[in-house]
Structure formats: structure tokens, C-alpha cells
């Protein structure tokens, strides 16, 4: 979790989360990678993006897999293809899921910036860089 405030007071921690800017919220929608992806990329977790394939690990939809349809940074929730509930009038609506309850099983690597970011983070975990 990114450091939003130095305070230890729960009141101020909650306020910082509530008032967090969108660029900080992007890190708050991180999910763990599957063991296979972890081994392949050398990274433990990444922010969820639209197009990633995820598996729900907790809750009523545990075990469901699907592509991420939408990432709502304001509510800190993600919407997954196939994870829907039916309204009283019969129309299906996506069920918001917190990213901590999912595991990324397939990454959408269509973005070059994301590829570079993964390589940077993996190098940091390996101890690469210019330390002596």
C-alpha cells in the first residue's frame, strides 16, 4: 500500500484513503499474481488493469475466472466478466469485487509502459540496479 500519510491514527489513515488522488488509488487496486506468473515475471503483485484475466479467491464468486471489464478507482473495485447478479427486473449487473480478493492469472501486456514497469520492478526484487 502506498504511504498516503505518516500518521498512525486510524482516523487520519481512513481520511487519507478517502481523499487519495487517482494516481495513488491506482496502486491501491493491486492484486497478487498466480504462482506461474510470479515465477515468470519475478514480481509478486501488480495493479489490476482492464483486460487482465483474474480468478476470484474469496466471496460468493470464489473460483470464477474472467477478464476485467472495468476498474473503478473512485470506489476501489473491479468488475469481472461473468461475475454478475440479477436485479429484480431481471437485468444482469456486474458485481463489484475488491482487488485484494482476486488473483491475476493472465496479464494484458498490450501496453509497452506496463512491460517496462514489470521489468523495472523485477530488477529491483532481484537486486539489480546500481548498488555496490
Curated annotation (Swiss-Prot):
GO molecular function: rRNA binding; structural constituent of ribosome
Keyword Ribonucleoprotein set for record: yes
CDD domains in the record: KOW_RPL26 (cd06089)
Keyword rRNA-binding: yes
SUPFAM superfamilies: Translation proteins SH3-like domain (SSF50104)
Gene3D superfamilies referenced in this protein's UniProt entry, alphabetically: 2.30.30.30
Subunit structure and binding partners: Part of the 50S ribosomal subunit.
Family: Belongs to the universal ribosomal protein uL24 family.
Name of the molecule in the record: Large ribosomal subunit protein uL24
Organism: Aeropyrum pernix (strain ATCC 700893 / DSM 11879 / JCM 9820 / NBRC 100138 / K1)
Gene that produces this protein: rpl24
Amino acid at each position: 500500500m502506498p504511504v498516503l500519510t505518516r500518521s498512525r491514527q486510524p482516523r487520519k489513515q481512513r481520511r487519507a484513503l478517502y481523499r487519495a488522488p487517482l494516481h495513488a488509488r491506482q496502486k491501491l487496486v493491486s492484486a497478487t499474481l498466480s504462482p506461474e506468473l510470479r515465477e515468470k515475471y519475478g514480481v509478486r503483485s501488480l495493479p489490476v488493469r482492464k483486460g487482465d484475466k483474474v480468478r476470484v479467491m474469496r466471496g460468493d464468486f470464489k473460483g470464477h475466472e474472467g477478464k476485467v471489464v472495468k476498474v473503478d478507482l473512485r470506489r476501489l473495485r473491479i468488475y469481472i466478466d461473468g461475475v454478475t447478479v440479477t436485479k429484480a427486473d431481471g437485468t444482469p449487473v456486474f458485481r463489484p469485487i475488491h482487488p485484494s480478493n482476486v488473483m491475476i492469472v493472465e496479464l494484458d501486456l498490450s501496453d509497452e509502459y506496463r512491460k517496462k514497469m514489470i521489468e523495472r520492478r523485477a530488477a529491483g526484487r532481484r537486486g539489480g540496479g546500481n548498488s555496490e
